[in-house]
Amino acid sequence: MIEKVNLMHPDKVADRIAGALVDLAYKKNTNPKIAVEVLIGHGKCHIIAETSVKFTKSEVKQIVNRIAGKMKVDFVQVAQAVHLANNQGGKIRCGDNGIFKGVPLTKEQKNLSAVAREIYDKYPSDGKYILDGKN
């Protein structure tokens, strides 16, 4: 079974907001330290940023409004923990996310993915579709 999530699903929107905040950090600093968590839904966006770069609430709201539309923004910013900053001071850094290229799919799963893309093109709204090939 595979799960395909629409591009307008709150999880995908949250990923784009987090990415935009990371981009902003790199505009402000050539070597920022930043970790961002975003939870979005029901007209609210909650953001926690652990970073060496300072963001204004206005900058964050502008990003959220541009990507997700007008909604209430709850933003918390904290400095990176000292032991993490010291651990990441050299060339080698750590993080909890890697680069995801995908997983091998069977021919049936590829066909189902194509169906999901057609559905997303026709209905570009929040939604989740689980394709298990049973129907």
Regions found by a protein language model. Give the residues of each.
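A domain-level signal for the structural core that forms small-molecule/cofactor-binding pockets
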Residues: 1-135
